Each structure stands twice: as structure tokens, then as C-alpha cells.
């Protein structure tokens, strides 16, 4: 699917599209351009209200201009529209704001159902609200106090066992520079002061939820030289981008409960949960981006808050190119760099089962995650099960 067709499809799923269907329009018809631009401005105002941080006027003006130009091309040329990075950045902001693929603040372990960008996801999240709260409580930020960590953290982690969290190996590399892995074992030294912080939500302080990282328990095996992705040399789908970390207990501070992980040997689901089109959500700490992202630059100081972002699986494990192990799936959730290590969670089902470990994304096009049901044996081995 081309970029233009993909965004037309997403816009046809948003909140405005639902209103048009009720009025007799064809199913999946995107709403008018003025309505989408109004929704984008409403989302910017909502972020200002929630954070108390005023939007940067120049970045806001540029973003609205990019969105206007992108929508003009998209609606004028349809699925054959030519879209550059500037237009794609504008469209990504639109789908975050119109209910297609929102990025929502987590407050008190849930989202505000009044958020203007929530759209049709409000009903889905309400249905599994207790499960979502449990997941949000068990997702933390991998904090790095060193001067080279410009955002103050390196990624996201989530509780996978008693005192244990899962994240990406490349997140571990950022907090243990020079560390290497061999046969599932890590050799290296953690930076001083690194920790996992299960709070940092918008809307005020919560009880302290920070736990120092004690040690590295296990890491996923490295991929061979022959399995590097031909278009993205830093990616190697033959390797497992996983690290299990043990956290220090803190007196008087309860440790979050482990998140349920879907298993490939489950006798009921039989490894078939993470299918194409299934609704999922991701909880993490979106931070920097390797590509221009004006929506993020509008609010320079608020990128490190805990967020929840819903979406869908684009391709299930076994359908992704250059994946020799058949353990990678793709999804269309809006993500940025700090989301590395996030859990991809079932939204259509129980609202709490981890279906994937997010590890990378091709900005504005697709994101990659290890399918939980395809790494059951590896995860069991890492946890000593």
C-alpha cells in the first residue's frame, strides 16, 4: 500500500469518518479538509491545556501549513498523490488528532476519555479500562541521568516478572555503553544511577515509582551478518532485540505487577492472537525522532510523559519481509524514539495481553515488534522458566 493510500485508509477510520457514515456517505470516506484542520488545532489546544506549556507559534504555523498542503495533495490526487517527508509529517499530525491514530496522555494510569483525538477508540478503551490501568501501572521509563542522555531517558520497559522488566537490547546498550552480547549473555557495565521510573505522567506528581536497575539478567541472541535488513542496516531481524533487567527493591515502595504475555503454546489461542488487522495499543515514553516531526517540536518539553497510543497490526509474524525467524510483526501506531522497548498490547481481546515487543520503526510508514507468541521459548529461557 502506498503512503497516500495508507493515509486515506487511516483518515477513513477516524472520528469524522464515522460521522459521515451516519450521514449516508460511503463507508471509509475521509472527512472534509477544514474539519481535519480544525481537529488538529483542537488537539494542539488540548496539549497546551494538559501540560501548561504554550505551543511554539512558528512550529504550529509550519505544521498547519504542512497539513493543509498534504491534505490538498491527498484529496486532489487520491491514492496516487506524491508525498514528501514534509507532507508525511503533516499527515501524521492529522491522524494523531482526528481519531485515526491518536497519542494520548496517561493520567492516573488511564487516559482522559474527553481527549478530542480519542475518536472511536474511546469505546474500546472503556470496555477494557481495568486491564489498561493494570498495564499502564507496569510500564516504566528507562531513566539515564548522564549528560549525554539529552532527554534524561533511553526508552521504555515493562514488568515481566517479580522485580524484572523487559526492554530492548539496544536500550540496554544506551545505558551500558560498550556492552556486548554473546550466546544470550551480556558483558558490560551499567551507567551509574540508571533506573526504571513507572510514573512521570502528565497532570501532577504521583507517589514515587522509581527503582534502580540492579543487573542485567539476560539478553536476546544477536543476528548473523547475513540477516541484516537490506534497506535499514541497523536492523537485523535475525536477532532478538530483548533485554531482561532486574530492579532493586525499595523499602515501602510496592513493585508493579507483571503484565500477562501471550504464549505460542497456549492451548486455546494456539499462537494465533496477533493477526493482521487486530486492534492493539502501546504504552511508552515517546521521545526524539530521527526524522522531522513538527508535532513533537511544537511542545519541546513534554515528549517524555507516559503516553498510550492505539492502532492495528499491519502484518503478522511470517508475513514480514527479511525476517528469517518469522518472529517480527508490523503495526501502524504512532511512535517515536523513546517508545523502544514498549509492550504492544491486545486491544480487541482482553486488553492486557502483550502481543509484541516494539523495537523499531520506519518513520511515518510502519513499525516493527517481536511477536510475543513467536518468542515464547526465548522469553522463558531469559526468565529462567
Protein language model annotation of sequence segments:
Residues 2-42, 46, 315-329, 336, ...:
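C-terminal subregion of chymotrypsin/trypsin-like serine protease catalytic domains
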Residues 42-45, 73, 130, 296-303, ...:
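Polar/charged alpha-helical tracts
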Residues 1-155, 308, 312-316:
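Protease-domain processing segments flanking chymotrypsin-fold serine proteases, especially trypsin-like
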Amino acid at each position: 500500500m502506498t503512503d497516500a493510500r495508507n493515509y486515506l485508509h487511516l483518515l477513513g477510520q477516524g472520528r469524522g469518518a464515522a460521522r459521515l457514515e451516519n450521514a449516508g456517505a460511503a463507508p471509509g470516506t475521509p472527512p472534509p479538509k477544514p474539519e481535519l484542520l480544525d481537529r488538529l488545532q483542537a488537539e494542539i489546544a488540548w496539549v497546551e491545556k494538559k501540560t501548561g506549556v504554550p505551543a511554539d507559534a512558528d512550529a504550529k504555523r509550519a505544521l498547519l501549513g504542512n497539513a493543509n498542503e498534504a491534505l490538498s495533495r491527498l484529496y486532489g490526487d487520491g491514492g496516487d498523490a506524491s508525498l514528501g517527508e514534509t507532507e508525511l509529517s503533516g499527515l501524521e499530525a492529522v491522524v494523531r488528532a482526528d481519531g485515526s491514530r491518536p497519542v494520548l496522555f496517561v493520567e492516573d494510569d488511564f487516559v482522559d476519555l474527553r481527549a478530542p483525538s480519542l475518536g472511536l477508540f474511546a469505546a474500546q478503551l472503556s470496555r477494557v479500562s481495568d486491564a489498561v490501568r493494570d498495564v499502564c501501572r507496569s510500564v516504566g521509563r528507562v531513566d539515564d541521568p548522564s549528560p549525554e542522555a539529552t532527554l534524561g531517558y533511553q526508552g521504555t520497559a515493562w514488568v515481566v516478572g517479580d522485580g524484572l522488566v523487559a526492554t530492548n537490547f539496544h536500550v540496554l546498550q544506551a545505558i551500558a555503553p560498550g556492552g556486548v552480547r554473546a550466546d544470550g549473555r551480556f558483558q558490560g557495565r551499567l551507567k551509574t544511577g540508571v533506573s526504571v521510573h513507572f510514573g512521570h505522567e502528565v497532570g501532577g506528581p504521583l507517589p514515587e515509582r522509581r527503582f534502580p536497575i540492579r543487573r542485567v539478567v539476560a539478553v536476546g541472541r544477536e543476528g548473523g551478518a547475513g540477516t541484516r535488513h537490506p534497506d535499514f542496516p541497523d536492523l537485523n531481524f535475525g536477532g532478538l532485540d530483548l533485554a531482561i533487567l532486574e530492579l532493586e527493591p525499595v523499602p515501602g515502595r510496592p513493585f508493579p505487577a507483571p503484565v500477562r504475555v501471550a504464549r505460542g503454546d497456549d492451548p486455546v489461542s494456539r499462537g494465533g492472537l496477533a493477526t493482521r488487522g487486530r486492534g492493539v495499543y502501546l504504552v511508552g515514553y515517546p521521545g526524539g525522532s530521527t526524522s522531522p516531526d513538527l508535532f513533537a517540536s511544537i511542545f519541546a518539553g513534554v515528549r517524555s510523559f507516559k503516553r498510550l497510543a492505539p492502532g492495528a497490526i499491519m502484518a503478522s509474524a511470517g508475513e514480514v519481509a527479511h525476517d528469517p525467524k518469522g518472529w517480527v510483526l508490523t503495526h501502524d501506531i504512532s511512535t517515536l524514539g523513546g517508545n523502544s522497548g514498549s509492550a504492544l498490547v491486545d486491544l480487541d481481546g482482553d486488553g492486557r495481553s502483550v502481543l509484541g515487543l516494539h523495537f523499531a520503526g520506519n518513520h511515518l510508514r510502519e513499525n516493527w515488534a517481536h511477536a510475543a507468541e513467536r518468542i515464547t521459548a526465548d522469553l522463558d529461557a531469559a526468565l529462567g522458566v
